[in-house]
Amino acid sequence: RIKLERTNSMEGLYQTQRIKDLKDKMLSEPRYASIEQALIITKTYQENEDDPKIIQRAKSLKAALEKMEIRVEPEELIVGNRTAGVRYGVVFPESGSTWVDKEFETLPTRPQDRFNVHQEDIETFRKVIKPYWEGKSLEDVLNQRYGKEINKIAKVVKINQKDHAQGHICPDCVKWLKMGPQGLLDQAEEKLKICKEEQKDFYESVKIVMEGAKHFMVRYHDLIMDMAENESDETRKQTMIKVAQNCKNISERPVQTFHEAVQSTW
């Protein structure tokens, strides 16, 4: 029998200079609400109005992965974020934007979870993004289905987290790591050859998203390699090249190392 001893000792746990530098950068950076993805997604939907909803969603995700600004800190060993700002918050109009519209001006001063907002972003949101999504967002669709009685109840209790996207908590990580985006893309192409007509949109959407995921990974590879060329510290330069190579590797094949697995899952 193994004897377990309870201890409060933190001996052996320490913070490296690299981690300290990353932490200091993150905590010192101002927080902003970003409409970058919202603009990309809105434009993509506008350009593909006749497509099935699942294809619209796939194309909008691919467009965001291909066009949104990316950034890497030299100290990072695992890269990737949904905005260039480390602590930025994303406005996602497809889920719903009523609360954002109501609270934009108070985001910098509210008691909790504050975000700065550029005035021009507020104006763009209200002129370009919000008008397009009125009546089309998930929030709007659910409000139509609930009826007046259910909406009254929702003022007291939480009825469906209609303003939250929960997909991030239920991915099939095992399949993702075993196949990678290229493997899933190949699988979708094979399925398209034999699937029923009503299944085609789904497999086509998988193809589109995996193409976007591969491109996103390669973008990070290219950015880090450019940064490495100007890095004077040889040790850090070699580390950056390794991180870049990980990004390229996982875009082309299943993961082969723990480092690649963590990067791919992130």
Spans of features found by a protein language model:
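Structured, charged N-terminal subsegments at the starts of enzyme catalytic cores
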Residues: 178-266
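Long, non-catalytic protein-protein interaction scaffolds
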Residues: 2-191
